[in-house]
């Protein structure tokens, strides 16, 4: 689509999809969690709108990586990195649309990693092989919805119990009893310099980490059978987490801070990816009956705040999403110490996929809820 035509499109979700397609050539694609998230959002927009160009783009993206023998370009099992699983969620719909066995083989290749992926002594997945005995909130989103869709698609219900175990374990270990918020990560060995030596938890409530977790739970529930005996456990976890998140929503803007509970600390800022993830997770949770209806007010405030404060429209109608934290992790080389100063020092990148993908998903949810925002 010609960029000058984008401003004539009626919804924010499709305007962002068109803006993304205009600036995201296939040669820049990466088999990585953030690109997978962005492409999944484009696919969801295609399913809802019926726009074939969106689905065609997704097909081309998947085919750019999946070889005829089912191996995945740039992916290696032995890296044992949960971040590399998330893009695999696109393989299920590719398989359903085509019946092509190479997509099934690619799915099984990713499951090979998950079958042997290192675990903590309490049987939770390490975030990555290079981060021993560590569980990160991010990792629940990276691996668990994929496994849940696999369990549903290929009728392997025993996987659901292990998925729920991982969610319950990390919530138990990272939840702060005073605020109800979740710390970014947990080191079972309590050896990392970034962790509290008594609890093993990192020291701050990073908005996007909690956003990953909320998105993971609402997406896992898409596949978990309605009659599963532990389904209510996930619903209760979702409610606890959302209740805590809504309490720290900024009153003036409707957005959320990079470090959730320290709005007045110098350097903290209203961050886009966490805010878009919260709007998506809350709105979807309300729509599907997991959350009380009154939470839609929080989602609406957040959505309005995103459009009012973080979305820019250029002369061609292309959208830009500002204030996206480009990346934040713990440990590694150079070592990331998990301090407040570390989290606020990470580079801010406009239109980073980790913000654009959740923005599209959030906008689709709000549009389904009948919210018609005009900037």
Annotate each PLM feature.
Residues 3-36, 48-55, 64-82, 86-88, ...:
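CBM-like carbohydrate-recognition segments
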Residues 7-28, 56-73, 105-124, 157-186, ...:
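Long, well-ordered core segments of solenoidal/helical folds
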Residues 20-23, 40-45, 79-94, 126-142, ...:
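Carbohydrate-binding/catalytic loop surfaces
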Residues 49, 98, 150-161, 220-232, ...:
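Inter-helical turn/loop segments and adjacent helix faces that build the functional surface
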Residues 140-141, 204-217, 276-278, 359:
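Alpha-helical bundle segments that constitute or directly flank the non-heme di-iron/ferroxidase center
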Residues 214-263, 267:
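Oxyanion-binding "anion nests"
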């Amino acid at each position: 689509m010609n960029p000058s035509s984008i401003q004539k499109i009626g919804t924010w979700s499709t305007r962002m999809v068109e803006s993304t397609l205009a600036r995201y050539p296939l040669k820049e694609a990466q088999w990585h969690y953030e690109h997978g998230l962005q492409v999944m959002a484009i696919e969801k927009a295609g399913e809802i709108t019926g726009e074939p160009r969106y689905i065609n783009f997704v097909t081309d993206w998947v085919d750019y990586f999946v070889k005829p023998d089912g191996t995945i370009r740039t992916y290696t099992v032995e890296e044992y990195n949960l971040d590399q699983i998330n893009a695999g969620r696109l393989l299920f719909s590719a398989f359903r649309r085509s019946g092509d066995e190479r997509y099934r083989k690619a799915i099984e290749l990713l499951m090979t990693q998950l079958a042997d992926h290192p675990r903590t002594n309490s049987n939770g997945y390490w975030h990555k092989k290079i981060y021993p005995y560590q569980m990160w909130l991010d990792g629940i989103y990276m691996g668990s919805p994929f496994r849940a869709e696999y369990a549903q698609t290929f009728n392997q219900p025993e996987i659901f119990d292990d998925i729920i175990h991982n969610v319950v374990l990390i919530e138990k270990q990272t939840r702060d009893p005073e605020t109800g918020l979740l710390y970014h990560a947990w080191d079972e060995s309590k050896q990392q310099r970034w962790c509290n030596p008594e609890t093993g938890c990192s020291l701050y409530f990073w908005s996007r980490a909690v956003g990953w977790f909320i998105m993971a739970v609402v997406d896992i529930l898409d596949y978990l059978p309605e009659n599963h005996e532990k389904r209510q456990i996930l619903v209760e976890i979702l409610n606890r987490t959302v209740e805590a998140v809504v309490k720290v929503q900024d009153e003036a803007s409707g957005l959320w801070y990079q470090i959730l509970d320290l709005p007045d600390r110098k350097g903290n800022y209203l961050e886009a990816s966490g805010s878009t993830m919260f709007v998506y997770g809350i709105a979807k949770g309300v729509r599907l009956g997991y959350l009380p209806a009154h939470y839609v007010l929080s989602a609406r405030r957040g959505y309005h705040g995103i459009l009012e404060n973080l979305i820019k429209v250029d002369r061609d109608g292309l959208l830009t999403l500002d204030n996206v934290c480009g990346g934040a992790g713990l440990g590694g080389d150079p070592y990331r110490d998990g301090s407040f100063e570390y989290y606020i020092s990470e580079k801010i990148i406009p239109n980073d996929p980790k913000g654009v993908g959740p923005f599209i998903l959030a906008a689709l949810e709000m549009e389904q809820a009948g919210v018609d925002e005009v900037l």
